[in-house]
Swiss-Prot record:
GO terms classed as biological process: protein folding; protein tetramerization; protein transport
Annotated gene: secB
Keywords (A to Z) from UniProt: Chaperone, Cytoplasm, Protein transport, Translocation, Transport
HAMAP family documented for this protein: SecB (MF_00821)
Superkingdom per UniProt: Bacteria
Naturally occurring in which organism (per UniProt): Bordetella avium (strain 197N)
Name of protein: Protein-export protein SecB
GO cellular component, one term: cytoplasm
Length: 172
């Protein structure tokens, strides 16, 4: 009976665990370099949005995941505003198979963080007295697959160039 209890406890402690421990706004900046003169422009703005995903290991089973957005809005080639924000989260990932770690950190974690980032960016833009910009949904799976394809292409080009990179140089 005692052996069964120990086996149950071991199995329980070895079960995969995925927990969001904290969500926080790591960085947010708003610049309006051409204010107040830009407010006199009559043309509609052109919006450019770039999104990046990152992360780092903080402890054996604790990771920080980040989603960074840069929004540049221009009117007649003049910057109306530039917003840069990074939303971060601390996640516990224990007993996860190694082949699942990268997809979890590159897809699942950013998907959980992005709604917070969207709200923070919309709020920051509203505080400039301009209409809020509501960022569209992002398919982080497609973004992850695109990143994998780019990395594979870089490795292929490196192999063709005769330059040998250490394995750590090809990982992001």
């Amino acid at each position: 009976m005692a052996d069964q209890d120990q086996n149950t406890q071991q199995t329980g402690s070895e079960a995969p665990a995925f927990n969001l421990q904290r969500v926080y706004l790591k960085d947010l900046s708003v610049e309006m370099p051409n204010a107040p003169h830009i407010f006199l422009e009559q043309e509609g703005p052109a919006v450019e949005v770039t999104i990046n995903v990152g992360g780092q290991r903080l402890a054996e089973t604790v990771f920080e995941s980040t989603v960074t957005v840069t929004v540049t809005t221009r009117v007649n080639d003049k910057v109306l505003y530039l917003v840069e924000g990074t939303q971060a989260g601390i996640f516990e990932l224990a007993n996860i198979p190694p082949e699942q770690m990268d997809p979890i950190l590159g897809i699942v974690c950013p998907t959980m963080l992005y709604p917070y980032l969207r709200a923070n960016v919309a709020d920051a833009i509203t505080r400039t007295s301009l209409p809020a910009l509501h960022l569209t949904e992002v398919n982080f799976q497609a973004l992850y697959e695109q990143r994998l394809a780019e990395m594979a292409q870089q490795q292929e080009q490196s192999a063709d160039s005769g330059i040998i990179l250490p394995p750590s140089a090809t990982r992001q």
